[in-house]
Structure formats: C-alpha cells, structure tokens
C-alpha cells in the first residue's frame, strides 16, 4: 500500500471534520479497494493518528498529534523525520554535505543538544515543540545568510497566523515573541566551498515552543521563555505546522523579498536597547531596519551604527 493512499485517506478524513465516512465511500473516492482503505487506516493509527472506526459507520479522524511525513502534507523535497536527534541542524548539515537537494526538510520530536545563536543551548523537550531544519541551495551570496534568517522569521509568523490565529512579534534578528515571551529561535548556518569561497548551502534551523509548560524550563529561562499553548493542547499538530513553515520559507527563497513585512513585525525600533557585539556593550536607541536587514542604532552622542550581527535587549526604562 503506497503512501499516496495514506495521504489521500488522511486528506479525506480531515476534510470531514470529525464526521464518519463509510469504507465504501472512501474506497470509491480514492479509487482503491476497501481492503486498501482498511490497511491505510491501520497504518495511520500506528503513526499516531486518533482514528476511530465503527461497524456500518466507517472511519473518522478524532484528533491527536501525528508525527510522520504524511502529516506534513504535500512537500516538494525529501523529508527526514526522527523521534530524537542531537540537533536537527547537525543532521541537516551532514545531509547537505552529502548532496541533499534544495528544500530538504529535517524534523525531529526531540533534540538532546539543540543550539541557538552564540552557542547557547536551545531547550527542546520531547513532543512539545516544532524543531526543524531546512536545506537551502539557491544562488547564494554572503548576504543570503542574513536574508534567510529574516525570511525564516517571517515564514514562522505567517504560518502561526494562518494555522493558530496568533500574531507573533519579531525581535531583531532571529527571535519571535508572543505575549512578551520568546517562543521561537532561528539559527542559520552556511557551508562554503574551500576553493572558491562561495556559499554552497544554508541550513536554517527553527525551534518553536508549541505546548511547552513552565515546568519544562530551567530556572534561568522561566521568566523569559514562553510557548504558544503552555501545557497544551494545541489546535494544530507539530508536523502540520512544520510543513506550513517550511513551505512558506521555500516560497520566499531565493528572492528573500519580505523585508517590509519583517519591518512591520519587528518591535525593536523605537526602543532604547542594550547592544552586545562581543567586543563591547553599550546603550543605544534603535532607529530602524535598513535595506540590508541591519538594525540601525544611535549611540549616546549621536553616532549611528548599522548592526549586522550582535545581540540586543530592550531596556525596561530609560534614565538620564
């Protein structure tokens, strides 16, 4: 029994919105035998779908959070899905080095050593978040790493709005916030040809807290980290949301033409911030996002800088 039958059955039952459909109706609609429908239903149940069957009534999809490639939905590139990984970005980079094509998606239910920017650990409790990495192979330039991160933030915000009805704000450059708490981080890494110095691929890693509860955070994150639906349940499955995010990002690549939308969602300009560049830390007024995606700030004394990298945090009050 092919994956196409499973996918078609899943789509038919999802469209029925919890109503029963008889085995005969499904067989006729899908152009397969009733035995094939039954086998597909068994496979979906084994993959985590809450599938009910009843004599003389048929089948219905009762809900659940299935985590499998079929649940991602139609997708134009290979999908690699895992129960547990050290890091989805690490696996994606290994696949990229092996020649995995543009759009390859790595999805995991749990990361043992998820990473954020500046080498920070990204907490990834099992079954409670969307943890994915996407391989991009457009015509690449050095500026594309920043553009890909910006586009990924927009892709997450679009997908969450479409499927959850929630509006996320963006904190330059790579964090998304909901109700004042960080719910998503993005890490973009690049592979370079050693001879030419040209970028060969980008791996965009996205970690979105979906149903993580306060008890899941270590103490140092408890006051700043959040999730879309703390403790659950969520109205959308992790795989469906991951697929929506990945498809949104692929539509933005390779043009990465979403800077105006990024600016509209970014809440940093207009605030006093603390800037940490690695070399120095200073207070500044965040002014705008320029056409290269850099954060333009004005230091005390009037000197302006356009930040390509670095970390900013909004200052709670402005004194002096």
Regions found by a protein language model. Give the residues of each.
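Long, positively charged amphipathic alpha-helical accessory segments at protein N-termini or as interdomain linkers
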Residues: 2-33, 140-168, 178-320
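N-terminal lobe of the biotin/lipoate ligase/transferase fold
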Residues: 2-161, 184
